[in-house]
Amino acid sequence: GGPQVPPPAADTIVDASGCLVTPGLINAHQHLYQNLTRSMAPDFGGSLTNWFWTYFSMWQHLDEEAVRTSTRVGLMELALSGCTTSADHLYIHRAPGWIDAQVHEARDIGLRFTAVRGSMTLDESDGGVCPAGMAEPHAYVMDESERLVRQWHQTEPNAMTQIALGPSTLMSSTLAVYRDTAALAADLGVRLHTHVADDPDEERFVRERY
């Protein structure tokens, strides 16, 4: 080794002998609500479409308590694994206030958190994979997205809470909502977040539809 330099003065000294010290880990993409069904392993034949339909039948019963609980459990597990920054893409909104609940949980735990206000606007009646009744109106998505950014998004260095905008997928969101979300994100100065070409099902869907 090199020259031994005495450590600077500190209020607290942690003996990390025998430990691996790393920077805080970053989780760039997750769906925390899916913690509620992670023990289930149905056979969906390797098809994303079948996967959607299998799990949407359960996720359509989500409520704020389920979102709050899954967020708390998921973020606590991440913190225990060494993660200090996480993004979560929540695109199911059966009622208003779910992103707000996530922000409160993240602040309580102390993780740096980017809440992605996801959306689904293309349901099965229009050829999408989103079950009828789970799609949101286009205008409502835009209004809620702007509200969340203005209420929660922090812009200062080392901000602990940020909002990003993210239609879920072209299989469950219209081109119009993609375009308008991108324009709104640019106007508000926030990030975009989505899924692209997850599997051959999505590629076929996009080629056939667009």
Residue locations for each model-derived region?
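Proline-centered helix-kink/hinge sites
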Residues: 23, 60-64, 167
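Histidine-rich, glycine-flanked metal-binding segment
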Residues: 1-22, 165
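Alpha-helical scaffold segments that flank or form the walls of functional sites
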Residues: 38-112, 142-158
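N-terminal capping/lid subdomain adjacent to the active-site entrance of alpha/beta enzymes
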Residues: 21-25, 30-32, 58, 79, ...
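Metal-coordinating catalytic core of metallo-dependent amide/deamination hydrolases
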Residues: 97-210
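Short, ordered loop/turn segments at secondary-structure junctions
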Residues: 3, 37, 91, 118-119, ...
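Histidine-centered catalytic micro-motifs
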Residues: 23-35, 191-200
